[in-house]
């Protein structure tokens, strides 16, 4: 007998006990290397924007309209129309978005992948996506799954008589799951009192989370932890919807508008429902939740466990939701699956059955629906919408557009003929460039003016970084375009050293005015461009100080936003609570500073080598917040040297923590005991973490002087242009 037949083959690559099992607190750099070309099946020269522009969008919409009423035996349509199912699919695709870090949302089509494809709140959406496959198959690469999911929701609304606000394509598919923090609970739908709860205090939801339980999009429809209390549920609704950038009016419009259509499904006990897609057998082919209750579909379907139809027009836009909400008193009951829900007292049977035209039912509501009546603020808005149907329709159209486009970033990324003409404040509008751009000669002249202005390398670099590093690759917000660093709230953020920033901006504005006043023919430089250009001049000068010649690329074309074009409250979420690139922590956090650095780097779409080069360079250029000396491992400040790495890796230095929290360290000369340097956790991680140390050793080597400078410039230029979608 051969060895192969004796021994079971159980040692495949990637299996076995992992590093994470051995060292659960080890810094995870994997999030910096997601969504690379290695997982993307598209050709290297594939341009999705160009592919989408060739799409016959009207033909796609026509096919989607036909699908709405083409009920399939394997998953029959409620009321003969898939509209309600597809509205829920689109809502749940977009509704994972949260403002705190911009993660989640419809971009990338993440609903196709774990964990979202198997969340308890997404039961049966596997069927919705499978219904769409023939259309996706037909149009192929010209429409992404991410775009198709949202377009289908829009067409569903339109097919049921609702006029939508518009639609934009441009969401590029991802090909692997995002690595997003959805909570620490180990059990789906874990209650708030359980281990690793996301709640503290009276009911304070952990940031950045925007859902009340693991596996839910927003709130528990039965009420907080399943307690059927509409007033208490209103607290959860307000908190979670606000964390998705929705105010009270938008929240009411979305709930009432969405619940005008379709129904929930709770025909029988949840014990009849099988494993979710990620745990189902191969034979299920990516589907999940196979039910043994009756036929397991149609009238026997089990999704949320609730059995509610809100309106008498579940496939047609109407004002029935508010009519029923206010026309009846409501009594608590339970669904056939045992879930808490509400039924109208003394109401007639006015609600159609989803599959039997001879049957009617009394109106039913969810606990969270009744919140719109029994919360005083929601009730006021709800009555106004009830009495003014046109206002309600407009509010829902706008809120739905915001919900489904919030994570797309600026209008420059919007594609297609259905993009609405109106510019909206939440899109962080930036005026179109209305002047002739500066040329190479102007760039050189402006660099000279900036360097002669009295501003230091540190000031130039720090200001450019502060302007550009607000960018978030998650929701494409922030960045240098718009020069919002000179506006509230950014100009007042602690990390930006407001008093120092004001001096720098005043000097740069003087350079800008002198240049613009001297021009003829309409040529101008925007402050947004000048801030980035000044940073480039600072980096070039720093490299020169180190004996290296570099040219930082520069592309003009940024414009200056106004205060009126800036939503102060919405912009406030971009304020860094931590920026390891500037050695900044606003407060002490439970999450280690080095993990916050990696999180920031991921939002900046940086790789581990890019992050390493930027930290090492920014330290020696004096970009620390508050001019702190931690991590400034050089006696040649404002020179773009590799001193940070050389001195960090020097075995002549012994490091010891000097704070109770182990977040400040002193590096002493091993021979004399003299303090040589001070550093933060962010600084020391580049010598402690094996993978980061390997990168630090590259840049700390004797032959790395020029390589480091050029790598820093490349990473710097990347950050400066992250929001330049016009250059893509």
From Swiss-Prot:
Record's keyword annotation contains Kinase: no
Covalent cross-link (Tryptophyl-tyrosyl-methioninium (Tyr-Met) (with W-91)), residues: 218-244
Positions of the record's site feature: Transition state stabilizer: 88
EC code: 1.11.1.21
Active-site residues per Swiss-Prot or TrEMBL entry: 92 (proton acceptor)
Transmembrane regions listed in the UniProt entry: none
A single Gene Ontology CC term: cytosol
Source superkingdom: Bacteria
Cofactor: heme b
Gene Ontology annotations of biological process type: cellular response to hydrogen peroxide; hydrogen peroxide catabolic process
Residues binding heme b, per UniProt: 259
Changes after translation: Formation of the three residue Trp-Tyr-Met cross-link is important for the catalase, but not the peroxidase activity of the enzyme.
Cross-link Tryptophyl-tyrosyl-methioninium (Trp-Tyr) (with M-244) mapped to chain: 91-218
Enzyme type, top EC level: oxidoreductase
Any Pfam family the entry gives: peroxidase
Keyword Magnesium: no
GO molecular function, a single term: metal ion binding
Keyword terms of this UniProt record: Heme, Hydrogen peroxide, Iron, Metal-binding, Oxidoreductase, Peroxidase
Role according to the record: Bifunctional enzyme with both catalase and broad-spectrum peroxidase activity.
Similarity remark: Belongs to the peroxidase family. Peroxidase/catalase subfamily.
PANTHER family on file: CATALASE-PEROXIDASE, HYDROPEROXIDASE I, BIFUNCTIONAL CATALASE-PEROXIDASE
Subunit structure: Homodimer or homotetramer.
Protein name per the record: Catalase-peroxidase
Source organism: Burkholderia lata (strain ATCC 17760 / DSM 23089 / LMG 22485 / NCIMB 9086 / R18194 / 383)
């Amino acid at each position: 007998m051969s060895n192969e037949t004796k021994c079971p083959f159980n040692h495949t690559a990637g299996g076995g006990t992992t590093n994470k099992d051995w060292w659960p607190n080890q810094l995870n750099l994997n999030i910096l290397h997601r969504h690379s070309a290695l997982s993307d099946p598209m050709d290297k020269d594939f341009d999705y924007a160009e592919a989408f522009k060739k799409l016959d969008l009207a033909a796609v919409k026509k096919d989607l309209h036909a699908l709405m009423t083409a009920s399939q035996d394997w998953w029959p349509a409620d009321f003969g129309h898939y509209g309600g199912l597809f509205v829920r699919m689109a809502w749940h695709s977009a509704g994972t978005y949260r403002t705190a870090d911009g993660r989640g949302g419809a971009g990338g089509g993440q609903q196709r992948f774990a964990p979202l494809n198997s969340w308890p709140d997404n039961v049966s959406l596997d069927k919705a996506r499978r219904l769409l496959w023939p259309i996706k198959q037909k149009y192929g690469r010209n429409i992404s799954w991410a775009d198709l999911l949202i377009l289908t929701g829009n067409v569903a609304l339109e097919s049921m008589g609702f006029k939508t606000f518009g639609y934009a394509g441009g969401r590029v598919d991802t090909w692997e799951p995002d690595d997003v923090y959805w909570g620490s609970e180990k059990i789906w739908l874990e209650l708030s009192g359980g281990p690793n709860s996301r709640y503290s205090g009276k009911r304070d939801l952990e940031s950045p989370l925007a859902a009340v339980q693991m596996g839910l999009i927003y709130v528990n429809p039965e009420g907080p932890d399943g307690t059927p209390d509409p007033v208490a549920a209103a607290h959860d609704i307000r908190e979670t919807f606000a964390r998705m950038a929705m105010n009270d009016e938008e929240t009411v419009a979305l709930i009432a508008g969405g619940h005008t259509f379709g129904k929930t499904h709770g025909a029988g006990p949840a014990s009849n429902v099988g494993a979710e897609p990620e745990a189902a057998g191969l034979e299920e082919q990516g589907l999940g939740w196979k039910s043994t209750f009756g036929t397991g579909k149609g009238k026997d379907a089990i999704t949320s466990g609730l059995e509610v139809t809100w309106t008498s027009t579940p496939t047609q836009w109407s004002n029935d939701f508010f009519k029923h909400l206010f026309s009846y008193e409501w009594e608590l009951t339970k669904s056939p699956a045992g879930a808490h829900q509400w039924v109208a007292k003394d109401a007639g049977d006015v609600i159609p059955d989803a599959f039997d035209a001879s049957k009617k039912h009394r109106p039913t509501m969810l606990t969270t629906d009744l919140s719109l009546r029994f919360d005083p603020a929601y009730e006021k808005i709800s009555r106004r919408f009830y009495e003014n149907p046109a206002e309600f329709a407009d509010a829902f159209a706008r809120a739905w557009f915001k919900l489904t486009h919030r994570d797309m970033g600026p209008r420059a990324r919007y594609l297609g003929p259905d993009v609405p003409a109106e510019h909206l404040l939440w899109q962080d509008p930036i005026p179109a460039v209305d002047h002739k751009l500066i040329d190479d000669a102007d760039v050189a002249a402006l660099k000279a003016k900036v360097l002669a202005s009295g501003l230091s390398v540190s000031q130039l670099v720090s200001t450019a970084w502060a302007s550009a590093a607000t960018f978030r690759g998650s929701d494409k917000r922030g960045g240098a375009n718009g020069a919002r660093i000179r506006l509230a709230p950014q100009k007042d953020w602690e990390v930006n050293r407001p008093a120092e920033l004001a001096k720098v901006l005043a000097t740069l504005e003087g350079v800008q005015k002198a240049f613009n006043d001297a021009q003829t023919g309409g040529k101008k430089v925007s402050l947004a461009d000048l801030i980035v250009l000044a940073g480039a001049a600072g980096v070039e000068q720093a490299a020169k100080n180190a004996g290296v010649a570099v040219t930082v690329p520069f592309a003009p074309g940024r414009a200056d936003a106004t205060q009126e074009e800036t939503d102060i409250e919405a912009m406030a979420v971009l304020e860094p609570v931590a920026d390891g690139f500037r050695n900044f922590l606003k407060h002490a956090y439970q999450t280690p500073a080095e993990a916050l650095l990696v999180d920031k780097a991921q939002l900046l779409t940086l790789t581990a080598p890019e992050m390493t080069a930027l930290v090492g360079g920014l330290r020696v250029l004096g970009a620390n917040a508050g001019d702190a000396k931690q991590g400034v491992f050089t006696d040649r400040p404002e020179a773009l040297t590799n001193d940070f790495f050389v001195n960090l890796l020097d075995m002549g230095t012994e490091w010891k923590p000097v704070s109770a929290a182990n977040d400040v360290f002193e590096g002493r000369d091993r021979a004399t005991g003299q303090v040589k340097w001070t550093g933060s956790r962010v600084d020391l991680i580049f010598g402690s973490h094996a993978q980061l140390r390997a990168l630090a050793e590259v840049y700390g080597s004797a032959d790395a002087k020029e390589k480091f400078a050029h790598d820093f410039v490349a990473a710097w230029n990347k950050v400066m242009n992250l929001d330049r979608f016009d250059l893509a």
